[in-house]
Structures are given as C-alpha cells and as structure tokens.
UniProtKB/Swiss-Prot annotation:
Primary localization class, coarse: plastid
Top-level taxon in the UniProt lineage: Eukaryota
Protein name: ATP synthase subunit b', chloroplastic
Stretches that traverse the bilayer: 26-46
Gene name per UniProt: atpF2
Miscellaneous notes: In plastids the F-type ATPase is also known as CF(1)CF(0).
Length: 162
C-alpha cells in the first residue's frame, strides 16, 4: 500500500515538474479525439433515437389535439342542431296544442249553442203543450160549468115550476 502511495505522489510531482496541470503531449489530442468520438457515438446511439421518440410523441400529441378539436367542433355543431330541432319540436307542439285548444273551444261553443237551441226548442214545445193542455182544460171546465149551470138552472127552474 505504501508503494502505491509513493507511486501516486511521484506521478504528481513528475507531472508538476514536466508541464503542470495541462501537458501538451500526445495525450491531449488523443483525449480530444476520444471526446469527439464519444459525442458522435452518443449522437447516433442516444440522442437521435431520443429525438425521434420526442418527435413522434409531439406528432402524436398534435394529431390527437387536432382530432379532439375536430370532434369538439362536430359535437358543438350537433348540439346546436339538436337545440334547433328541439326548439322546432317545442314550437310545433305548442302550435298543435293551440290548434287543439281552439278546436276544443269551437266544439264546446258549438255544443253550448246547440244545447241552448235544443233547450229553447224544448221550452217552446213544452210551452205549446202546456198552452194546448190549458186550452183543453179550460174547454173541459167550460163544458162542465155549462153542464153544471144547466143543472142548476134546471133544478132552480124545476123547483120554481112546481
């Protein structure tokens, strides 16, 4: 272990003595080349697939948003159409109800007029019958009065003549 520590301290002292922290020898261009290769490899292996996935996701989201917007517009149109149809149906129903009410009122008025006419006719007929019965009763009474007065005369005259 002591040997390892010694080696590290010797390497540090040698690097400080040779050029300091940045040595411009063959390792610097090699490290730059490694960095460029790592960047290229990461670009092809990691960044491009992730970029492609992100692009696909963005396309998917934008397509879904466009589709949802189209469906929302269609739903709004259908809603307006159904509301219009509902208003028309309500108006039609109100017209039918108003027409039925007016027909019913007309029928009721006609029936009332007919009933009044029938009642007036019945009253007139009853009055005629009562008048006819009254005349008949008066004639019968007159006949009976005449008969009774004749009887009274005969009795009175018959007693007076005796």
């Amino acid at each position: 272990m002591n040997n390892l520590i010694m080696l590290v301290t010797n390497a540090v002292t040698l690097s400080e003595a040779a050029g300091g922290l940045f040595d411009f020898n063959a390792t610097l261009p090699l490290q730059a080349l490694q960095f460029i290769l790592l960047t290229v490899l990461l670009t092809f292996i990691f960044y491009k697939p992730i970029g492609k996935l992100l692009e696909e996701r963005e396309t998917f989201i934008s397509n879904n948003l466009a589709e949802a917007s189209a469906k929302l517009l269609k739903a709004d149109e259908l809603c307006e159409q159904y509301e219009t149809q509902l208003k028309e149906a309500k108006t039609g129903a109100q017209d039918v109800i108003a027409k039925a009410e007016s027909e019913a009122k007309g029928i009721v008025a006609q029936e009332i007029t007919q009933a009044r006419a029938d009642a007036a006719s019945l009253i007139a007929q009853t009055n005629k019958e009562l008048e006819a019965q009254k005349k008949l009763a008066l004639q019968q009474l007159e006949t009976q009065i005449d008969e009774l007065s004749q009887l009274i005369k005969e009795k009175l005259l018959g007693k007076v003549v005796l």
